[in-house]
């Protein structure tokens, strides 16, 4: 059901593969190797995580993909991050229970100077029929090569995949910052967060509809940052969400 994606051009992925070794080779398809980590398939790709486009291969092994990747940011700091990928207005399928469970586990395992963050939906790939979750270590080369940090990431992923994930209220956020501010209810287990539409996106009804539809479980709650979503789009979005029975929590 779960499939891990590691990219050989990515330093965090390379260390991750070393940490979880041995990963016996199952088969090769072109420039892609299929390996095995305990009971989970590992797709090893000779490229960048954001360039992976063989969703068909992932779908042949599972429904929920976890991409191991480095994280970069303008003002770098030691950080563990999770998010759903998507290059707006198109996005991947988001898996709120899985992404939020990994986030909670990373936050539990994080050690100084590392902190944890839930990011808004951004960058490729865009999936159509399997969910995608990025799990990252950042934010400079020093952290990407930090074996202890990657071991912590691997521990978090393995812990979640070997657990019975308890679902909470599935939610999305509209108009939040890139580094999500509504993580307290996620950490408390009150909700599972899927797509987060950041305020720098041109937020329209179509963008919200696309994101709403691309979740593994129907969204029951939406957190709307009013000041970052202008009318008439805001009114259209509220009307759409209400028509789907979604509880709307407004902020700002």
Swiss-Prot record:
EC category name: hydrolase
Cofactors required: Zn(2+)
Documented EC number(s): 3.1.1.96
Cofactor note: Binds 2 Zn(2+) ions per subunit.
A single GO BP: D-amino acid catabolic process
Keyword Metal-binding on entry: yes
GO terms, molecular function: D-aminoacyl-tRNA deacylase activity; zinc ion binding
Alphabetized InterPro entries for the sequence: Deacylase_DtdA_archaea, DtdA
Catalytic reaction list: a D-aminoacyl-tRNA + H2O = a tRNA + a D-alpha-amino acid + H(+); glycyl-tRNA(Ala) + H2O = tRNA(Ala) + glycine + H(+)
Keywords: Hydrolase, Metal-binding, Zinc
Quaternary structure (record): Monomer.
Function as written in the Swiss-Prot or TrEMBL entry: D-aminoacyl-tRNA deacylase with broad substrate specificity. By recycling D-aminoacyl-tRNA to D-amino acids and free tRNA molecules, this enzyme counteracts the toxicity associated with the formation of D-aminoacyl-tRNA entities in vivo.
PANTHER family found in the cross-reference section: D-AMINOACYL-TRNA DEACYLASE
HAMAP family found in the cross-reference section: Deacylase_DtdA
UniProt family annotation: Belongs to the DtdA deacylase family.
Protein name: D-aminoacyl-tRNA deacylase
Native source species: Pyrobaculum islandicum (strain DSM 4184 / JCM 9189 / GEO3)
Classification of source organism: Archaea, Thermoproteota, Thermoprotei, Thermoproteales, Thermoproteaceae
């Amino acid at each position: 059901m779960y499939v891990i994606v590691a990219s050989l051009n990515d330093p965090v992925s390379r260390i991750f593969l070393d940490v979880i070794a041995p990963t016996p080779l199952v088969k090769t398809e072109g420039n892609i190797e299929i390996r095995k980590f305990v009971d989970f398939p590992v797709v090893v790709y000779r490229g960048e995580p954001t360039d992976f486009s063989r969703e068909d291969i992932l779908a042949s092994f599972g429904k929920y993909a976890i991409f191991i990747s480095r994280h970069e940011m303008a003002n770098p700091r030691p950080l563990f991050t999770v998010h759903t990928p998507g290059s707006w207005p198109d996005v991947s399928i988001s898996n709120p229970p899985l992404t939020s469970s990994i986030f909670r586990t990373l936050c539990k395992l994080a050690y100084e100077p590392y902190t944890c963050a839930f990011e808004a939906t951004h960058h490729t790939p865009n999936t159509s029929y399997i969910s995608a979750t990025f799990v990252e270590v950042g934010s400079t080369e020093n952290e990407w090569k930090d074996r202890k940090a990657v071991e912590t990431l691997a521990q978090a992923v393995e812990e979640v995949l070997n657990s019975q994930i308890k679902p909470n209220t599935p939610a999305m956020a509209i108009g939040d910052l890139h580094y999500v501010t509504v993580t307290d209810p996620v950490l408390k287990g009150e909700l599972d967060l899927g797509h987060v539409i950041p305020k720098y996106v041109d937020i329209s009804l179509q963008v919200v509809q696309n994101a709403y539809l691309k979740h593994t479980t129907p969204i029951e709650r939406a957190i709307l940052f009013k000041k970052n979503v202008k009318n008439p789009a805001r009114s259209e979005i509220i009307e759409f969400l209400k028509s789907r029975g979604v509880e709307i929590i407004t902020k700002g």
